[in-house]
């Protein structure tokens, strides 16, 4: 069993062990840099976070990959940790591959320090995304990280820098880019091919921002490392709504609270702002201004202004609605419609935009680990997308507009830059990248 405490200087030393060459390589350079450290020529992967998303999605996806060996699981709840360990061991022991057993612990730092682990899949609550991601990159691991990528704008910037400076392949879990749940790639192809003409606005129908946590204290049962679950968040008593004990089939309510998440706005915004960014060809940039709704009680209606005048609005039907000179297009899970209908009914011609097809979100990540190319939902795409939602939340929480510089990841008014991050407990400060 891993030790419960690891001093921060040990964590920083471990996390920074290979961060000695801050060279940023382009995709063509990466393509010749493929590597396999595993003696059995498989990619040794550790799963960090064993909740519902990991149980329903990541675990089965990883176990079915022939070139992956899931060698470790990390989870603060002992019941879930044991369940995942048993699932992995049963899966591999029933096959013919050479398997030495999957280990389990609750401290991600001990996993990241292991030389035999090539990559990590992070499926923790939102406030526990950035630190393991950055540390994994600095320790030479490739990363798949659930969306929304971060809790703050500063974390988003550092995740990109950590990946680039350490030449890591980092996939954001915005799997709609791999056409999971609907024809999202096709919608983007229609828009980029000019089927709508010049785009004037986009509406994004997703949930509301989070609120301060006001849950009462509950008695905690043995088997949960509650202080580790809190991590950077302020110390507070346990409540089962935040981390239900054992295995469960629902999404816990930590997403509703500011201390741990940006709410439905970042949760589903990480999917649909992402599709809007993709369609607008803004994957390396973002809006320059956010304006809150006039109704001070409203949690929808924030407006995001791009430097070319395109306006994105939080609100409207579920998914994304694009409005252009020649009509409109609505893309949502299981739905792609347009007015006029011919916009999406007419097949793409050879001369129009055809984007690469992803073989699946995990498969794309694993293939890129070999090729050293950027995956379909590369870390910067995820970082730029979540920054939009963070800007919107700041506009809602403070009921004011902000001017933002996407190139510097900072506000035009330096007096606002303290809002790029938030206070965090001493043990969990952001490392130098």
Segment roles from a protein language model:
Residues 12, 59, 82-85, 109-112, ...:
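Non-transmembrane alpha-helical segments in soluble domains
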Residues 168, 211, 252-262:
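Flexible glycine/proline-enriched surface loops and loop-helix/loop-strand junctions
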Residues 147:
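Short basic (Lys/Arg) and small-residue
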Residues 15-19, 23, 30, 243, ...:
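C-terminal helical cap and adjacent loop that interface with cofactors, partners, or active-site loops
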Residues 150-228:
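A contiguous active-site-proximal alpha/beta segment in oxidoreductase catalytic domains
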